[in-house]
Amino acid sequence: LIKERNDVYSENIEDLELKLVKASSNAEKEEILNEISYIKNNYDLECKTETTLAEYGYPLAYVKINVDNINVIVYENEPDNLKAVNIIKVVMNDTNKGLPVSLHFKS
């Protein structure tokens, strides 16, 4: 999942950079630059949160920030409610987005 996200991120940034070169108005350029900034900020935050989760003992975690929620997938052999609460707290503190967290455990 992380490799797929990295590939999509790279493709999206490349596409937006091409659009930026072709943009004719300053308003259009500003809109594209804002979109690039939004994508980069979310990507950096996803990676930071995954690193924090690894530090808390969840090295196999995937975080995806969406417009209306944050999806988290954690590979864990023995999930329980306490682990879920701890993971959600870490994600909420790290992202500081105020978005609901959708947590899924996989074994």
Where are these regions (language model features)?
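Bacterial N-terminal Sec-type targeting sequences
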Residues: L1-N96, P100-S107
